[in-house]
Amino acid sequence: MTRVPQFENERAVSWKSVIPPHTESTMHRHDRYRTIIGVVGGDLTTVSPDGKKTVTRYETGKAYWQAPMPPGETHKDVNETGTTIELIVVEMK
């Protein structure tokens, strides 16, 4: 998984996530509101520390709004598919 910085200013930070097949991120959390845009869409699995899986389908060319995670919650992102997923994330500060 690669994170490519796009821009940062006093109001927002943006990056492109490139998620090759069968790769995963480290455990992390999202403390801010964010918009996610599918550049090359696909099904991305989030896995909580207790092993619970949630699959989110990101469609190419579509934008998604996500709220901050509840306090103390973490997850990792896993691409269990056979294709690379590319997402642009714009996180509000």
Could you say what each language-model-derived stretch is?
Residues S17, S25-H30, T46-S48, V55-R57, ...:
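Short histidine-centered beta-strand/loop micro-motifs
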